[in-house]
Amino acid sequence: MKNSQDIRSGFKAQRYSAPALNIARCTLNVTRVLFIILVCLSATTLVYGQEEEGGEIESVEIEIVKVKQITMPKANRNFEKVPPRPADPLAPSMTYDFKSIDFAAPDYKPVVKPLRLKDETLSKIYGNYVSAGFGNYNSPFLRGSITSKRNAEKFYGVDFLHHSYGKGPVDGEYSGMGYSKLNGYLQGMGPKVTADLGLTYENMFNHYYGYPAPKPESADDIRQSYNILGLNAGFTNTKTSDFNFKVSGDFSYLDDRFEASESEAGLHFNSRYEVNKTQAFILKSDYILVARKDTKVEAKPRHLFRVNPAYEFTILDRFRLSAGLNAVVENDSVGKDKAAHIYPDAWIHTELAKTVDAYAGITGDYEKVSLHTLARENQWLNSNVGIFHTNKSFEFRGGVQGKVARKFSFHVGASVINYKHLYFFVNDPLDRSRFDVVYDNAVRLNLFGELGVVHGDKVNISLRGDSYNYSMDKLDHPWQRPSYKVGFYSSYKIVDKVLLTVNMISQGGAKAYDNEADKVVTLKSAMSLDAKVRYFISKPLSVYVEGNNLLNNKYPIYQFYQARGLQISAGVSWSF
């Protein structure tokens, strides 16, 4: 009990100040902690004792004595608040007066001045040019063109060309030749129709130098000259539309140095009507009138009328087809069984790849043959030769063409044509320097391949090869016609001011009949290698050096007509 009283007296309620109370609480907390530690130690001892003595609890008396008392002084508290700062009155006092203000601004009339740009200087157009040169074989060269510039409503101009050889491969002036052409043209463009008009004059002269020895007394005795005067006119729609057309007409008159003359007139119509993107109707038509006169040939009109309708359409978005016919009416007398001829005209095109197309088709036609045609192909014609149109009664043609890697293009194919009265050249038995014309039926197989390479403006190459095989009806051979042709054409821009062109032409396998030896001969293969280097002194002015037949081959053009050997020429060109 004494202990209990001591404990109670130690915790007698007293009034302490705040610091004293905090210290008392801290002391009490320490005392409690010590008490708990002692209890735990006692319990451990008791447990241990129980384990050793069999679990009996010994009676223990604990006495806690608190004798220390902490006394803290009383704290002084100040409960006085800070008074607010007095506000100073405004002097003078402010008054507010609100008034409505009407603001009327005048109408704004801006003056916009467009930006004045300097007039752009138009680049000079070098549409006119003149080129002149001279070479061995006494060969002057002159070529030029003068045209209008920057006119959206009309275009006109004049072209001229002269190239002659005063001497040739046989007896100098006895084998001279030349060609001249003067061409004037005018074109007017309206909003709906564009019309054009042209006038042309040509002169071709040569010598019959395929004579045997001795040579004639005068070169003028064997000179042949053709003069051709031509006129053409036409009109077409100016803007491309669903219906496009072109109508044209032409007239040409030819005479030679002797007594042959020929008039040729033609009317041509070409139209296309687009139904939609996959269908179209096409109509082509021609009428040609030819009249020739010679010492033994009376002027007789030869008519050739052709009409070719066709329908184009697309199926399966891949195949483009054209189905039509070609109807021809003519009045030639050779091999004539009927005046009217009808041929199928059907074609199919398909896309094998994005840039590769294949095509095939069958057709037929009548090919115009006149003195104009033969004289341009062979200037050593005899007088009074027979002239008839060629009936191409059947033709099949197919091939594949396309581009590879944008720089390479190719075209390979084959054609089979059945000709009726196809013309061939044979030497006159009485005068071997002149050629007669004979006709025969023939089937010709042509295999061809073409390759092109374009690399910007640096390189441009074209190579084509043709193989011909003839199956004749009556003639032993296709006289004077080659069995193969190879052509190589290229241009190279070596540097900015130097342009090189290299061309090569080769043909061979042609056969001819030698009347003097009474045997068939195979003409020597022809190969001509040509090169030209042009140096640009400035943009409008350049000079050139040209070499033809650089291999100096003495190959025959036709039997007894030898080609010129090495030819070198140089000249200057000026654009303005």
Name these PLM-found stretches.
Residues 48-120:
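N-terminal periplasmic/intermembrane-space "pro-region" immediately following the signal or transit peptide
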Residues 110-113, 121-130, 134-170, 174-182, ...:
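Outer-membrane beta-barrel translocator/receptor signature
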Residues 125, 130-133, 320, 324, ...:
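Exposed, low-structure sequence patches enriched in small/polar residues
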Residues 144-148, 158, 184-188, 231-237, ...:
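Residues on the lipid-exposed face of transmembrane beta-strands in outer-membrane beta-barrel proteins
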Residues 148-168, 280-284, 300-332, 456-464:
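Surface-exposed extracellular loop regions of Gram-negative outer-membrane beta-barrel proteins
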Residues 221-234, 248-319:
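Outer-membrane beta-barrel transmembrane domain signature of Gram-negative proteins
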